[in-house]
From Swiss-Prot:
Family: Belongs to the delta endotoxin family.
Region entry Disordered, spans: 423-458
Source organism: Bacillus thuringiensis subsp. kurstaki
Further details from the record: Toxic segment of the protein is located in the N-terminus.
Function: Promotes colloidosmotic lysis by binding to the midgut epithelial cells of insects.
Protein name: Pesticidal crystal protein Cry1Ba
Amino acid sequence: MTSNRKNENEIINAVSNHSAQMDLLPDARIEDSLCIAEGNNIDPFVSASTVQTGINIAGRILGVLGVPFAGQLASFYSFLVGELWPRGRDQWEIFLEHVEQLINQQITENARNTALARLQGLGDSFRAYQQSLEDWLENRDDARTRSVLYTQYIALELDFLNAMPLFAIRNQEVPLLMVYAQAANLHLLLLRDASLFGSEFGLTSQEIQRYYERQVERTRDYSDYCVEWYNTGLNSLRGTNAASWVRYNQFRRDLTLGVLDLVALFPSYDTRTYPINTSAQLTREVYTDAIGATGVNMASMNWYNNNAPSFSAIEAAAIRSPHLLDFLEQLTIFSASSRWSNTRHMTYWRGHTIQSRPIGGGLNTSTHGATNTSINPVTLRFASRDVYRTESYAGVLLWGIYLEPIHGVPTVRFNFTNPQNISDRGTANYSQPYESPGLQLKDSETELPPETTERPNYESYSHRLSHIGIILQSRVNVPVYSWTHRSADRTNTIGPNRITQIPMVKASELPQGTTVVRGPGFTGGDILRRTNTGGFGPIRVTVNGPLTQRYRIGFRYASTVDFDFFVSRGGTTVNNFRFLRTMNSGDELKYGNFVRRAFTTPFTFTQIQDIIRTSIQGLSGNGEVYIDKIEIIPVTATFEAEYDLERAQEAVNALFTNTNPRRLKTDVTDYHIDQVSNLVACLSDEFCLDEKRELLEKVKYAKRLSDERNLLQDPNFTSINKQPDFISTNEQSNFTSIHEQSEHGWWGSENITIQEGNDVFKENYVTLPGTFNECYPTYLYQKIGESELKAYTRYQLRGYIEDSQDLEIYLIRYNAKHETLDVPGTESLWPLSVESPIGRCGEPNRCAPHFEWNPDLDCSCRDGEKCAHHSHHFSLDIDVGCTDLHENLGVWVVFKIKTQEGHARLGNLEFIEEKPLLGEALSRVKRAEKKWRDKREKLQLETKRVYTEAKEAVDALFVDSQYDRLQADTNIGMIHAADKLVHRIREAYLSELPVIPGVNAEIFEELEGHIITAISLYDARNVVKNGDFNNGLTCWNVKGHVDVQQSHHRSDLVIPEWEAEVSQAVRVCPGCGYILRVTAYKEGYGEGCVTIHEIENNTDELKFKNREEEEVYPTDTGTCNDYTAHQGTAGCADACNSRNAGYEDAYEVDTTASVNYKPTYEEETYTDVRRDNHCEYDRGYVNYPPVPAGYVTKELEYFPETDTVWIEIGETEGKFIVDSVELLLMEE
């Protein structure tokens, strides 16, 4: 340091005539009093070596954090060995003596000798390890050097484990503390080497993991130990007077430099958290000794004995309360003057004002001491400059041997440099007149030396002046300088190739609700705290690199509550997530209560000078959130690849149970496996091809396990409504066994679409649109067969919904379990900065960056209640009692939408075994099963009776059991009456979805098939097509204005005008007899006429008038045996034969009909064992309504002579309403 100082200007002129030693005075007694004390005094031995070593090591470590280059590490270890085990006096002994003198406590001789001997052994071993490491780094392929290094590493690490307790001897913890901290630092650096080089010099992956876990554990333990005993030693020095404060402040400063600064860097040794070069910053402040005369035999000549203020008063005046980091910009010094004689007088520093500014913040001004003096103040400006050294002169003005002297500072030299412009350097001076026996030079570099003597101190300085306090009493005027470490830069510069740690106290301003609190000792400075929602203050950063570089955000926090943490850049939110509490309210802030978290979503800066803001929301209660620092982490290709690989490995391993790596966890969903497979597929082939292949095999195995346990058929939706080849068909009723169908795939409405995977689904998914009529819902269903189920077991249906509205989900066995789900869509998973999530061939680019969102939030809905799910995952469980393969009750899985606004996109459906039923759940399912069986027995008795009545009525319609010829007297009313009895059979179909057959479906379809046959035969016997006008005016010729209207659930022809006419040409069998039967109603005056005729003559007519009595038509009719049932069905037969459609067409709507057609035979509401469902049997001729009052049925016999007759309908006046027209062939 001496050589460096020669490069600076000489001592300022104001004190050039005065020696740093005191001049002799004529009075011998005064001369004696001014002698420097050589015996026991309060001024402890300040070892430049002790402080220098602590500063040097911390400064050097700051340059090799993260993963250093091999050359850097070898040089660093060589430096450490040279600093801690130098030639000459033992540095460890100097550490011991320095702390002993600070606390005035001698360590026992045995403890001293044991510690020093063990440290000497560690030094020898460490030096040997360091030399072997250098040899190996020069030739890593040499097997011998690798083997030697492996052996020495294991032995040296074990030596440290055994040695550390010797530096923590009971009742000797404080004097040994600096030794303990330095030894702990070496141990942690050694443990880091296992992660850096262990795999190369022979450590197995298990050994590396064990050493890493030990490093994490020891980092916590060493940190808490050092902080605890630092506080213990400091508190033991707390006194009541100024003398105790001097010792207290020296301990605080020197052990901050030698202990706490190291502790603050311990976490950054973690190469898994910091895998690249890392920039750390120390923002704590240290205070050099007060600028007052000390070490003089005469008590009053020492400033702290000259009626100085109390301990607490000095602490309040000199030590700053917690605050944001700021930088000194201007100092204005106010002076006072005292005079004893022309040869004894002094003008000295009496007070000052300071202007300082946080990074990018506003100017703050504070006043200290007395400023109401008559002497012109001296203003010194330091904007953008670091004051790296002060040379202050402590003056003592003697008033006589029996009077108290005045202590003051007449001269200070402030040495400054501009860190951004090294040529901008110099001195700023405060110099006032002084005449007295002598001055004491107080050089700040004695207490805060540069980091190295190999460069000028304006380049190698370790600290910068940040603030100045002053201890003021009537005869005491001594400033106290506050210093910050130079690692805390002025610009928050972010590099593209390093992790930049930025303490939160470097914010530009402090928002309301945020407070700065004293750091816990292991953070390297103060921290920020909030107890409510709000921001922590903006941090202005300077980006040193391309703006295309991507970064992530990490941060270190402690909290007594859960909270949402938001990060924004330039006003745009780039990250947010919910984080959990780390401690309980009232807990002490210890190392383990702070955790480091990092976001995975990268972002870019938009300008070189940018702003990062952090805030918290959604606190789970009253509590405290502490933030230590944030980290700006560059996303490099290698770093991203390694991070992605680690994340993929963790995700794949998490698929399987801990006890059996070949067994899939129950709570791992099929959707989750697909997302993990995406994660693996996106790994870089360039960086981790082998690992990628291995992980892909594991995730494929997991997918196979998922498929094996899934009881659903075709869960990937390869097809819907695909009929298996082996399914049998009931020829009699033309009814395919839906029970058999449903156990072999999906069945659904025609409007469902299967779509290929997108950015949400990896595999096929289905889209269910809305419907215009709740009686014709959109539906999808499948049956889990009884043979797939286990008795007394709970099963779970689950899947993933991209979005939905009014989606109803049912699980049906003994009863229906039901939920209605509204799941809001994700809009887009892709941020605006991503151009397109589509690959080159149009496929989804699942590797593109996307917003993070939490799909695992739960939503609880009561059974049957409609709710908005926040989770896109859904699950519904059902309990199975005893199983019966003959009954084959199974479980129906149903998805349904019955609203126009409804919709759903869903996939990855699973039906899996969850767990056996025990306890109350077992009792509950047995009760449900018994209740269901009791109802089933009652239903069977009822069904037997209803079925007998219905079958008798149906059989009466036909000639025999062949069901191919109707009885001669069978008419449409009899058919309708029989059909009504058939529909009294309950549980033919499920009320939840009437296309699914119920327990009585088979007998219902048997009889319903006969009804359909009867109607078909009856239609064939009636040669008039669309005679009931159910298909509007199809097959009829119309002249004038006519209409078909719905009345009493029937379709009626309405002729409102006399000039209108409706007619139809009908093919007949010449020579056979026919009956023309018409049911109609006449309103108003005039007559309604239905005429039948041939081309010439042979005309007959039925006339209708208002208020006529209904005629009873005869049942005995003639026959024409040679006329086939198929004759006369050509032409428009298909369009008119509306009643021949089976139930399977019930959900198809004919959009080509000429009128707004609604089927005539409406279904009445019917109470099922579950609930009413007015849509349940809306499929055919059910409850055919009787002819309303006022309608009249008339008929006549007609014998055509040709093969064509014409039927014409008209009126003379008023309105003529025709319900039906029939021309029936007479039978024998």
